Amino acid sequence: MISTDALLEHHEKTNRSAQWEGFNQAFASVISTGLPSEEICHLFFRIGSRMAQTIHVERCDTLDELQIAFNTRLQAIGWGFSSLYVQGEYLFISHACSPLEGSFGPASSPEWTASFFEGVHQTWFESQGVTAGLRVCAETMNEPSSSQILLKFGKA
């Protein structure tokens, strides 16, 4: 039996665009030596937010509908999938199969991908009319070998 991690690793390696690899690695090298980590994360958050505005999610009434809407948009553009679940006072978002994971080479940080998806999901939640003061933030920073991003949505 093939492990889930092995399948995800294969998916991520085979679905990366070779035509962008050199550009992405050069971009990562330039920004990682020219900007503080906090500013890079803010940049990726803003890019995620802007992207979410271009792939708008319609109003949903239930968590299941929201998960379906998120995944419909993400899978249509080959950006993986999310699982939403409530635990305690928070809604957690587990995202897998992001094409960003590993696409920027050794100069990048898992925080960049997490920040990007913070921006995507924050914008989508805001489009649902969420209460002010609720934020999406990375629950844990992934190890470089991790294929999932865990985000938490709740009071800031």
Predicted segments, located by residue:
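N-terminal accessory segment detector
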Residues: 1-94, 99-109, 144-146
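Short terminal or interdomain "cap/linker" segment that borders an active site or interface and mediates
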Residues: 85-94, 131-156
